[in-house]
C-alpha cells in the first residue's frame, strides 16, 4: 500500500475542474461496504470538489481477484444503485439522467450534451498530437 496514495488522489480530484475536457467520476458500489448514507455524503464531498460532468454509479460484479475479499452478497441490485444515485444526486446538484438495469448502472449529471463525432479516417494523420478540448466543440443539433 502506498502511504501517499490518498494525498495524490486528493490532488487529482482538485485538479479535475481545471481540465478542458469532460470529466466522469465512477463509483463502484459494493453492498455492505460503501453504500450507506455516510458513504454517500463522503462521495458527494469528493464529487463536489471534482465537479465532474457525469457520475457513473456502477454495481460491483463478483469476478476476478475480488472474489478473494468479497462475496456475491456484495453485488448491489439495480434498485440499490438507483436508491444510492437518487440520494447522491441532490447533494451534488445533479439528477439521475439515465440508467441501465442489465448493466446495473446509473448516470448522474446536469444534462446530456452530445458532441460531434468526426468522420472516420482510413489513414493515420501525420500529426497524432493531443486531441482538441471537447468542452469548446460545437454542439450537435438534433
Where does each model-flagged region fall?
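Conserved AdoMet/S-adenosylmethionine-binding subsite of the radical SAM
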Residues: 1-79
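Short, Lys/Arg-enriched charge-dense amphipathic segments
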Residues: 45-54, 58, 79-85, 117-132
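A C-terminal junction/extension of Radical SAM enzymes
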Residues: 78-117
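Radical SAM enzyme core and accessory elements
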Residues: 105-142
Amino acid at each position: 500500500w502506498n502511504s501517499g496514495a490518498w494525498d495524490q488522489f486528493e490532488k487529482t480530484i482538485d485538479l479535475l475542474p481545471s481540465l478542458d475536457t469532460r470529466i466522469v467520476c465512477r463509483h463502484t458500489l459494493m453492498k455492505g461496504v460503501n453504500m450507506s448514507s455516510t458513504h454517500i455524503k463522503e462521495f458527494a464531498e469528493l464529487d463536489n470538489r471534482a465537479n465532474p460532468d457525469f457520475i457513473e454509479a456502477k454495481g460491483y460484479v463478483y469476478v476476478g481477484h475480488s472474489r478473494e475479499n468479497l462475496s456475491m452478497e456484495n453485488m448491489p441490485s439495480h434498485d440499490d444503485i438507483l436508491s444510492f444515485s437518487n440520494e447522491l444526486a441532490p447533494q451534488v446538484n445533479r439528477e439521475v439522467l439515465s440508467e441501465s438495469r442489465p448493466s446495473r448502472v446509473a448516470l448522474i449529471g446536469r444534462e446530456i450534451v452530445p458532441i460531434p463525432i468526426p468522420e472516420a479516417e482510413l489513414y493515420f494523420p501525420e500529426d497524432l498530437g493531443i486531441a482538441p478540448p471537447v468542452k469548446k466543440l460545437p454542439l450537435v443539433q438534433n
